[in-house]
Amino acid sequence: MISSQAFVAGMCAIGAGLASIACIGGGIGTGNATAKAVEGVSRQPEASGKILSTMIIGSALSEATAIYGFLIAILLVLKIGNIG
């Protein structure tokens, strides 16, 4: 039979791994936004200022979810050390 402490530690490790998937999503979102911004600037160079400012705002929102996932993963990993 598995102890409750080992079970909680295992679930924290699984949760940390799943939370770190948010970092992958943030990277993909930022990459897609940058690719489309470069494509838009190449088509309309005169609108580069507006395109780039919109891209920066979108990238910030995309990276916010990655940062939240990273912080949750860190908190769960630190919780594993305090279970014992």
From Swiss-Prot:
Q: Which cysteines are joined by disulfide bonds?
A: none
Keyword Cell membrane appears in the UniProt entry:
yes
The annotated topology with respect to the bilayer is:
Multi-pass membrane protein
Phosphoprotein is among the record's keywords = no
- Chief subcellular location: membrane
Task: Supply one GO CC term from the record.
Answer: plasma membrane
Transmembrane parts of this sequence: 8-28, 56-76
| Assigned keywords, A-Z | ATP synthesis, Cell membrane, CF(0), Hydrogen ion transport, Ion transport, Lipid-binding, Membrane, Transmembrane, Transmembrane helix, Transport
Q: Where in the cell is it found?
A: Cell membrane
> Which GO-annotated molecular functions does the record name?
lipid binding; proton-transporting ATP synthase activity, rotational mechanism
Name residues in a coiled coil: none
Q: Which CDD domains match?
A: ATP-synt_Fo_c_NaATPase (cd18184)
Subunit and partners: F-type ATPases have 2 components, F(1) - the catalytic core - and F(0) - the membrane proton channel. F(1) has five subunits: alpha(3), beta(3), gamma(1), delta(1), epsilon(1). F(0) has three main subunits: a(1), b(2) and c(10-14). The alpha and beta chains form an alternating ring which encloses part of the gamma chain. F(1) is attached to F(0) by a central stalk formed by the gamma and epsilon chains, while a peripheral stalk is formed by the delta and b chains.
Which family, according to the similarity comment?
Belongs to the ATPase C chain family.
Q: Any idea what job this protein has?
A: F(1)F(0) ATP synthase produces ATP from ADP in the presence of a proton or sodium gradient. F-type ATPases consist of two structural domains, F(1) containing the extramembraneous catalytic core and F(0) containing the membrane proton channel, linked together by a central stalk and a peripheral stalk. During catalysis, ATP synthesis in the catalytic domain of F(1) is coupled via a rotary mechanism of the central stalk subunits to proton translocation.
Which PANTHER family has this protein been placed in?
Answer: ATP SYNTHASE LIPID-BINDING PROTEIN, MITOCHONDRIAL, ATPASE PROTEIN 9
NCBIfam families named among the record's database cross-references: ATP_synt_c (TIGR01260)
Q: What is this protein called?
A: ATP synthase subunit c
* Phylogenetic classification of the source organism: Bacteria, Bacillati, Bacillota, Clostridia, Eubacteriales
| Gene from which this protein is expressed | atpE
